């Protein structure tokens, strides 16, 4: 079974999970290839929800294509659930997210939800976070300041270029990748994140940081994880 089949399988499992929610509510929807499979699987059941709140421009485009109603987060009081993938997830449900560059939108929508339903394949499960480079979204003016502060954590800091992300965004490959918010992203490699909540708080206090791709405060409540044997449901 290949990676796409695993993503499709867990996307369909997430569809079944959210259809257990009472009808007429607003659903939070994440970003990325696994989230896309979830959106596609849910399309035939969009009438179950009063609308959706999207974590990125790309997700909004896909939801609208399928006929979902997409609401402004500022007009929504709260969400019963937020469904999204992860770049890494540890045994406690802490995650690294932001490989696709939309960590700030994802964290905002996740904070609105009563539960975070994480969907991924088993390759994303790790004993300790840090094998995947940790994304940090910053104000461009602060690149030097934030880079020096991040180096104190012991990792290698690099500025993400447009060529290292999605080609469909039509950004100049040799220029810094620009987020939906106009920010840049610093990727911190070589970390071993034994205390995700502590590191999340410390990095978020650095002047110039918009947010860090550690989801410890907004950790997963439910994990749907696919492997060759099927989909396992883990509650944290």
UniProtKB/Swiss-Prot annotation:
Keyword Isomerase: yes
Residue sites binding substrate per the record: 31-34, 84-87, 97-100, 124
Entry's Gene Ontology molecular function annotations: ribose-5-phosphate isomerase activity
Involved pathway(s): Carbohydrate degradation; pentose phosphate pathway; D-ribose 5-phosphate from D-ribulose 5-phosphate (non-oxidative stage): step 1/1
EC number(s) on file: 5.3.1.6
Domain of life: Bacteria
Record's keyword terms, sorted: Isomerase
Reactions this protein catalyses: aldehydo-D-ribose 5-phosphate = D-ribulose 5-phosphate
GO CC field: cytosol
Active site, UniProt feature: 106 (proton acceptor)
Function as written in the Swiss-Prot or TrEMBL entry: Catalyzes the reversible conversion of ribose-5-phosphate to ribulose 5-phosphate.
NCBIfam families given in the database record: PRK00702.1, rpiA
Subunit structure: Homodimer.
Family that this chain belongs to: Belongs to the ribose 5-phosphate isomerase family.
Entry protein name: Ribose-5-phosphate isomerase A
Native organism: Polynucleobacter necessarius subsp. necessarius (strain STIR1)
């Amino acid at each position: 079974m290949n990676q796409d089949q695993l993503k499709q399988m867990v996307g369909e499992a997430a569809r079944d999970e959210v259809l257990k929610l009472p009808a007429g509510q607003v659903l939070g929807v994440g970003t990325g290839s696994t989230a896309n499979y979830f959106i596609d699987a849910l399309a035939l059941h969009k009438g179950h929800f009063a609308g959706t709140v999207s974590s990125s421009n790309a997700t909004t485009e896909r939801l609208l294509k399928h006929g979902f109603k997409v609401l402004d987060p500022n007009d929504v009081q709260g969400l019963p659930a937020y469904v999204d993938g992860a770049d890494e997830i540890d045994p406690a449900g802490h995650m690294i997210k932001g490989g696709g560059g939309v960590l700030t939108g994802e964290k905002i929508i996740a904070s609105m939800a009563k539960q975070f339903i994480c969907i991924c394949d088993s390759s994303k499960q790790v004993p300790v976070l840090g094998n995947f480079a940790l994304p940090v979204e910053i104000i461009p003016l602060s690149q030097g300041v934030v880079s020096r502060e991040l180096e104190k954590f012991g990792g290698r800091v690099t500025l993400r270029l447009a060529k290292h992300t999605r080609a469909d965004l039509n950004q100049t490959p040799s220029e810094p990748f620009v987020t939906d918010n106009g920010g840049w992203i610093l990727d911190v490699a070589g970390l071993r994140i034994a205390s995700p909540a502590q590191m999340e708080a410390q990095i978020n206090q650095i002047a110039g940081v918009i947010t860090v791709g550690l989801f410890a405060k907004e950790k997963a409540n439910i994990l749907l994880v696919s492997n060759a044997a099927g989909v396992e449901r883990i509650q944290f």
